[in-house]
């Protein structure tokens, strides 16, 4: 996604059978990113500010959902700011993630959910793009990676990692 003048809104549909999952936001230095998470009932966390390192615990009383938000910088000299959101017993429905930044430099960010089999099929981004889904180890520098091909459909496999790395 990209933060505009105000903020970027990302919608996540959480399925009925979801017992918990982790979502990661990776930003670009030198920006500092903030999240405000809204539950299906409309309860909000308020702005959670990223930084060098820290944690915040939030309980959504109406949904009985617990959220642990951790933020840190991967490389403190010039690395990417990261916000990790751990949802425990998430209520089913549409969760809104509002992303803001300091408005410095490139204002793009990436938001990831776990891969297949680590999350229910009913939990997904309502609007997603498959073109920036490279995962480790294919996202390192000086490495050529390949995706998987589905010969039945004559195209890349739907679960294939593909796209450009973050750097």
Language-model segment annotations:
Residues 1-167:
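Loop-rich non-cytosolic ectodomains and luminal regions
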């Amino acid at each position: 996604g990209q933060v505009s003048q105000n903020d970027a809104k990302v919608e996540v549909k959480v399925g009925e059978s979801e017992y918990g999952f982790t979502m990661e936001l990776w930003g670009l230095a030198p920006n500092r990113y903030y999240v405000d998470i809204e539950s299906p009932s409309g309860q909000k966390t308020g702005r959670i500010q990223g930084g060098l390192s820290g944690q915040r615990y939030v309980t959504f009383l109406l949904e009985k959902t617990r959220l642990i938000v951790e933020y840190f910088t991967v490389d403190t000299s010039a690395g990417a700011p990261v916000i990790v959101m751990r949802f425990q017993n998430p209520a089913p429905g549409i969760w809104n993630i509002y992303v803001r930044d300091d408005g410095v430099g490139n204002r793009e960010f990436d938001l990831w959910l776990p891969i297949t089999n680590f999350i229910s099929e009913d939990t997904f981004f309502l609007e997603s793009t498959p073109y920036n889904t490279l995962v480790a180890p294919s996202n390192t520098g000086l490495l050529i990676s390949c995706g998987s091909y589905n010969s039945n459909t004559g195209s890349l496999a739907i679960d294939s990692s593909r796209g450009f790395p973050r750097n």
